[in-house]
Amino acid sequence: MAGNDWVNSYLEAILDVGQGLDDARSSPSLLLRERGRFTPSRYFVEEVITGYDETDLHRSWVKAVATRSPQERNTRLENMCWRIWNLARQKKQHEEKEAQRLAKRRLEREKGRREATADMSEEFSEGEKGDIISDISTHGESTKPRLPRINSAESMELWASQQKGNKLYLVLISLHGLIRGENMELGRDSDTGGQVKYVVELARALGSMPGVYRVDLLTRQVSSPDVDYSYGEPTEMLTPRDSEDFSDEMGESSGAYIVRIPFGPKDKYIPKELLWPHIPEFVDGAMSHIMQMSNVLGEQVGVGKPIWPSAIHGHYADAGDATALLSGALNVPMLLTGHSLGRDKLEQLLRQGRLSKEEINSTYKIMRRIEGEELSLDVSEMVITSTRQEIDEQWRLYDGFDPILERKLRARIKRNVSCYGRFMPRMVKIPPGMEFNHIVPHGGDMEDTDGNEEHPTSPDPPIWAEIMRFFSNSRKPMILALARPDPKKNITTLVKAFGECRPLRELANLALIMGNRDGIDEMSSTSSSVLLSVLKLIDKYDLYGQVAYPKHHKQSDVPDIYRLAAKSKGVFINPAIIEPFGLTLIEAAAHGLPMVATKNGGPVDIHRVLDNGLLVDPHDQQSISEALLKLVADKHLWAKCRQNGLKNIHQFSWPEHCKTYLSRITSFKPRHPQWQSDDGGDNSEPESPSDSLRDIQDISLNLKFSFDGSGNDNYMNQEGSSMDRKSKIEAAVQNWSKGKDSRKMGSLERSEVNSGKFPAVRRRKFIVVIALDFDGEEDTLEATKRILDAVEKERAEGSVGFILSTSLTISEVQSFLVSGGLNPNDFDAFICNSGSDLHYTSLNNEDGPFVVDFYYHSHIEYRWGGEGLRKTLIRWASSLNEKKADNDEQIVTLAEHLSTDYCYTFTVKKPAAVPPVRELRKLLRIQALRCHVVYSQNGTRINVIPVLASRIQALRYLFVRWGIDMAKMAVFVGESGDTDYEGLLGGLHKSVVLKGVSCSACLHANRSYPLTDVISFESNNVVHASPDSDVRDALKKLELLKD
């Protein structure tokens, strides 16, 4: 074909580069972000196969074959064409598979929606069809009215006066990148971009709002020699931009702060993809900080009662995952901002066909990221988005969010009608803000730069000279692009559009502010590849004197760069392939710059509000050059766009953003640890004289005895009377207190466990948690005994306590201990049913061996589906039995005798016939049922518990309620375990992996991501030991025992 000649010329040009480019030292592909390894042939494939069908490629191959010779050149050409042809076929095959996958997903979504709607049988007329505006959170109980929109300074003052009585404590979390309050190194790497600026400015703005006492922005402490020392400072105060109005509210600990929590490698700055194994460590450190700060604020402004966060706000998937765990541990509301979504990224990469799903996951840890986002949807009260596009086209890709079902649920909530255990987070569009107080749009032009003798001007900012030195004619309008050198920012297409449009080149200059660099060789491979491509294009089109690309700029220089472009009557351009929001567009508009922006993503919403420029297809060079030329050449259009931007920019101010943000937060139903309102001071010293009295208070505040120890686990009927429950608790307290008063003094001396202080676990110097998952009862018993025997000395002294953590019920635990000759009093606490129940050893054997902590249930019951969830699970089990059972054999059955109010247990006869745990989680999420599904005991049992319940979260609860130091816990696990196994191996606690125990990994065979993506076995907190001889040595190695 005539149009195919360039293919061979391109191939030959690549071959001329030489074979040395094929090795791993070469720069990565321009078009792929963070690709890793690069070969010229793959680069060619990326450029060709998306635009030519296989007929064209086949003809190129025929051409190569026709000129075959013994020479290496033609052999390589032939092989290359074969590879291209094969990849083109693979691309088509992938497209077919992708179409099938999307069709299957659509059917699953429709089926789930039908089943959910069928359960919710009440009919509504228009309520479930329209997008009803309601400020009730999706959890559903709050009825606070929404505050009116503020459109003037007068109404803002009125709103501020109404908020002065509030003393809110807010926590923001953003984990990756380098975060500091001043001189942010935006563009230094792909992790330090717009999100960093957004979270810092949001924290600063919230800290200046009336009614907000303190804001903490939690991030990672980085003490690496590769970064500035400031990133290793534990705390940094964010100075308000303008605090005169609210200075009277400032207190000792008030304001906004960056708090850096140490986690991960201490002396190494690592990319976000490698942070996943270390997130539990952050959760434990952040939990400790928040509890400490809550108590401090309580002493200052809370009349001695802790001031719990009004909300914890996670940013991006990693922080969202951490925030979900913190929300559960502290029982406070969660917010989420996704910024960039993993499922959307996966869809784009699969659509390109350049990487397999396995390669994508290996590079980006994309499946772990998606699971973090799904968990965040399970837990979040509200998801804040920048644009409507993010909701309609990105969040709807997730199992946990369905816009249609969300509207149905919201309509039911508004009418106080049951949702049958279904919950959906509320999606709220709140565009990011900006501080405009100190921005003065430049009204002059380039002729005014030098000033005159009568009206001297202030010296030009140094960055102006740094940019203008590149230009042979600095008087021309300046087209400004400000983005890091990342393939998705599409800078090379911009340079091509500029270089190929002669009229544009004659009328304007191009300034590319692409982050900071010292040397190209010192940049990341992706960034250096983009920059080298830009430089080659400048040379190709001979753009010397017309394009600026300075090496350095400070964050404080950015406003001056905008002013320079506006002074030259230039244009700001954002040509990104897709832009989640586009904060730089708002900044540019505030400085009087019209915009040309991508039509994909957030710029569409910004343009709708500002009406200050043109939208373009980022893949269309001609469209980009025409839009730029139109704005630069038409002065009337330029002036109109400038004026529109300045007129409408106030709608993106930080006060407006924060007002909407705070109005939403204050509409939430308050959530915080319940016991704190009645028996504060739980974390006092364990030897305090008030301990004995507090024990009785604790019992009266939702601690119930299991009187017979027979395993009657259905102790709290959701339909039952609260008065019955209250009378039983009061009777238990009377019996317990009578028994205590009548005890002889000698009985108190038996051991410290029964010294009258409850629970005994509070007084231990360190805690051993036995979390061995069942391979067989005998093996588990033997390993448990060996662990107990290894610390016999410390056990006798009372310095060590034991917790048994298991998927069994409390009655099964008792039978298990008795069968092995163990006494329940050997343990201080029991975490049962995979973390849905927490029991303590009873102080009085006459009342039964166990006490259940009811406050733990109130702590984990958030979004528990109850009877609606139970019915759905039974329906799922029935459908499975109908499909796969032989001879009427039931594969999965509900075990009523093992189930409790917060754990639905199913027994499994044929584990191989049951879908993987991820499939059941997916099915429930599609129906808006939020829960934690745990496959246990080698797949023979399924426990379905509240979404915020787990064995590791139960340990965090012990820290929150009783002050038990997580760093003083040693969790014993096997080599594998239940599907919640990964949660037990990360965090501040120590982990001992027993060799040869729980070796079967059948439950982990169909994981979405490998365990190595989420567990750091090289951590100093994880050791391996043999249950026969190394247990004590392992505890010494973890520094919990001394010689």
UniProtKB/Swiss-Prot annotation:
Keywords noted in UniProt: Glycosyltransferase, Phosphoprotein, Transferase
Alphabetized SUPFAM superfamilies for the sequence: UDP-Glycosyltransferase/glycogen phosphorylase (SSF53756)
GO CC terms: plasma membrane; plasmodesma
InterPro entries: Glyco_trans_1, HAD_sf, SPP-like_dom, SPS, SPS_C, SPS_pln, Sucrose_synth_GT-B1
Reported consequences of knocking out the gene: Loss of nectar secretion accompanied by starch accumulation in nectaries.
Modifications made to the protein after synthesis: Phosphorylated at Ser-152 upon sucrose supply.
GO BP, sorted A to Z: nectar secretion; sucrose biosynthetic process
Disordered: annotated span: 95-127, 670-693
Pfam (any one): GT-B_Sucrose_synth
Induction (record text): Circadian-regulated, with the highest expression at the end of the light period and the lowest at the end of the dark period (in 12 hours light/12 hours dark cycle). Induced by cold (at protein level).
Pathway(s) annotated for this protein in UniProt: Glycan biosynthesis; sucrose biosynthesis; sucrose from D-fructose 6-phosphate and UDP-alpha-D-glucose: step 1/2
Modified residues (Phosphoserine): 121, 125, 152, 155
Enzyme class: transferase
Record comment: activity regulation: Activity is regulated by phosphorylation and moderated by concentration of metabolites and light.
Catalysis performed (reactions): beta-D-fructose 6-phosphate + UDP-alpha-D-glucose = sucrose 6(F)-phosphate + UDP + H(+)
Gene3D superfamilies reported in the protein's UniProt record: 3.90.1070.10, Glycogen Phosphorylase B, HAD superfamily/HAD-like
Composition bias type Basic and acidic residues, residue spans: 95-117
GO MF term (any one): sucrose-phosphate synthase activity
Tissue expression remark: Expressed in seeds, stems, rosette leaves, flowers and siliques. Highly expressed in maturing nectaries.
Enzyme Commission numbers on file: 2.4.1.14
Function: Plays a major role in photosynthetic sucrose synthesis by catalyzing the rate-limiting step of sucrose biosynthesis from UDP-glucose and fructose- 6-phosphate. Involved in the regulation of carbon partitioning in the leaves of plants. May regulate the synthesis of sucrose and therefore play a major role as a limiting factor in the export of photoassimilates out of the leaf. Plays a role for sucrose availability that is essential for plant growth and fiber elongation. Required for nectar secretion.
Note: Plants silencing SPS1 show reduced shoot growth, leaf fresh weight and dry weight, and decreased leaf starch, leaf sugar levels and sucrose export rates. Tobacco plants overexpressing Arabidopsis SPS1 show increased stem height and diameter, increased total dry weight and elevated concentrations of sink sucrose pools.
Family of this protein: Belongs to the glycosyltransferase 1 family.
Stated name of the protein: Sucrose-phosphate synthase 1
Gene: SPS1
